[in-house]
Amino acid sequence: VAGDKVTYEKLDLPTGLWPFNVAVAPSGKIALTADSGDAGGSDGSVDTISVVDLEAQPPRIVDRVVVGDGPEGLAISPKGDVAVAVILAGSNNKPAYFYHRNGSLAVLRIDGKKVTKIKDIEVGGLPEAAAFTPDGRYLLVGNYLDQDFSILRVNGTNITDTGKRFKVPGHPASVRMSPR
């Protein structure tokens, strides 16, 4: 990017299969991609998050973290010490053998360029969207089928479900937060 011009530098990165979302850490040192697997969604098999070293010349994939079946939404906290991958877990495919009523979050600790899965948290039906509040104290997860958002509390790398939700008039497939 130079001013108002964007050029393709012909740098393709071999992320995992079907990369769906990309999130860049606030430090600008790493990016994460949600690799949804062979089906491009939930298929009963585990999938990964690719870790991209943006400081390497050229940037490259330095790790993959197994997160669960069908990572879709992806968010990194404002401090950059924790991320979440929204896991479909079969919640989009009721007749399938791998169906689960609810999806989950894979909570990922970020320490420099090392990313580690630390726990899973169950959320609602077909979760897709995730965003941290600007102050980093809360995380909102959009549950598409339930037409609501789960509200989770964030304390450092510890994320817990408050048990509270708020309804929306549509199906939350994505979400963004603004500082104002």
Where are these regions (language model features)?
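Predominantly soluble domains enriched in secretory-pathway, periplasmic, or organellar proteins
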Residues: 1-180
